[in-house]
């Protein structure tokens, strides 16, 4: 039996802040939360720092990028997942869905997707694992190879992932994230050193190629729709831009609208009973990098159920600080957006709140104005581990 406590903390509970809180943990489960509660034999003094649930991230693309720090460099996947884990754990993330793209396009291949998923499952059962690793299966809506591989992968993974999270994504210019193709053209100009004319021609070519495989989207939908209806998958509609997009997603039996690009789409998602996920980097910056609706606006309108890191893990805690500083949220409300909100969205019921009986994934941190510093991270089903900062080294 392992029992310890975190004393003298500022505990962020679901609807309130509890000062001078003692949180007692036994065998990875919270067994008591009390103001000025007694310390156990083993304890950590938080010295007034914030104690909050571990962050739950429903969409992170970071692991896919970790093995490729330079265009000509390829790192081993077993090293890469531990390297990336260290980064996200230092950002206070304790449960993470790795976005793995099933498609044959550019740097993404079906072969690499399967290799990524293999190492995630393998490392998850390692005695050295330091967080809860899960998979977000991302399907390019128009890629037949990706669809066939994803179907086979999901069936083979049933024992380790009974109800996988699947995102159905169509990044064809002129819809979704790049409904205004000018933003994609600007991105191509900056990232590939093209002129405006070259970027326009490049996007034109993408449209021709994507239109040629449009039929693959219709071939994938019956299987996805059936699997979602049977409860075999949790289906995300990615980048819905209009109420019509949301209405279509409802016919797929999607339950999540991920990254709605307009207020109207988010309102339609709420009216249809879909959970809504926004990007933490968007909330941190106060605006979308591709000209779409601000996550802060959706949060202020009550149209966001949770944030995900997308491409920047530390943005989760950064968004908490920013949302509180600019008055969009109270601290408990902002914390909910990166903990219980995402948990509820993806169907995880045993964590995400500081409550007796729940999994003791816990983060101790401070905010200097709106800028976070993580002092300690604990995860359930493992020995209590904390950063050197918490040990006073």
Question: Which residue stretches match the model-derived regions?
Answer:
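A general structural motif
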Residues: 215-217, 237-239, 257-266, 285-292
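His/Asp/Glu-enriched, well-ordered alpha-helical/loop segment
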Residues: 230, 272-282, 286-365
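N-terminal metal-binding scaffold of metallo-dependent hydrolase/deaminase domains
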Residues: 1-39
């Amino acid at each position: 039996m392992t029992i310890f406590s975190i004393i003298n903390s500022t505990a962020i509970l679901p609807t309130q802040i509890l000062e001078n809180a003692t949180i007692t943990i036994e065998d990875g489960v919270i067994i008591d939360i009390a103001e000025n509660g007694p310390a156990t034999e083993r304890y950590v003094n938080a010295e007034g720092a914030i104690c909050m649930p571990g962050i739950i991230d429903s969409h992170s693309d970071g692991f896919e990028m970790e093995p490729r720090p330079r265009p000509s460099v390829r790192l081993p996947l077993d090293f890469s997942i531990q390297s990336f884990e260290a980064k996200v754990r230092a950002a206070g993330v304790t449960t993470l869905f790795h976005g793995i793209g099933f498609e044959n396009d550019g740097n993404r291949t079906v072969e690499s997707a399967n290799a990524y998923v293999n190492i995630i499952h393998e490392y998850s059962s390692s005695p050295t694992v330091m967080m809860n690793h899960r998979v977000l299966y991302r399907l390019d809506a128009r890629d037949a190879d990706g669809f066939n591989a994803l179907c086979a992968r999901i069936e083979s993974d049933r024992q380790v992932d009974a109800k996988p999270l699947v995102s159905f994504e169509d990044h064809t210019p002129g819809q979704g994230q790049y409904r205004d193709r000018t933003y994609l053209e600007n991105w191509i100009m900056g990232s590939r050193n093209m002129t405006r004319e070259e970027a326009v021609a490049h996007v034109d070519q993408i449209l021709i190629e994507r239109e040629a495989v449009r039929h693959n989207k219709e071939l994938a939908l019956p299987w996805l729709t059936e699997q979602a209806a049977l409860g075999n998958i949790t289906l995300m509609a990615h980048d819905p831009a209009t109420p019509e997009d949301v209405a279509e997603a409802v016919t797929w039996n999607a339950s999540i609208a991920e990254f709605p690009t307009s207020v109207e789409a988010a309102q339609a998602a709420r009216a249809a009973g879909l959970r809504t996920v926004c990007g933490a980097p968007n909330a941190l910056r106060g605006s979308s990098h591709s000209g779409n609706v601000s996550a802060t606006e959706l949060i202020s309108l009550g149209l966001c159920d949770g944030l995900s890191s997308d491409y920047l893990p530390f943005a989760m805690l950064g968004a908490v600080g920013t949302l509180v500083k600019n008055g969009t949220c109270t601290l408990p409300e902002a914390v909910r957006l990166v903990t219980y909100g995402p948990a509820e969205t993806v169907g995880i019921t045993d964590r995400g709140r500081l409550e007796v009986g729940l999994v003791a994934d816990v983060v101790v941190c401070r905010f200097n104005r709106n800028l976070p510093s993580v002092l300690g991270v604990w995860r359930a089903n493992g020995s209590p581990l904390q950063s050197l900062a918490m040990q006073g080294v």
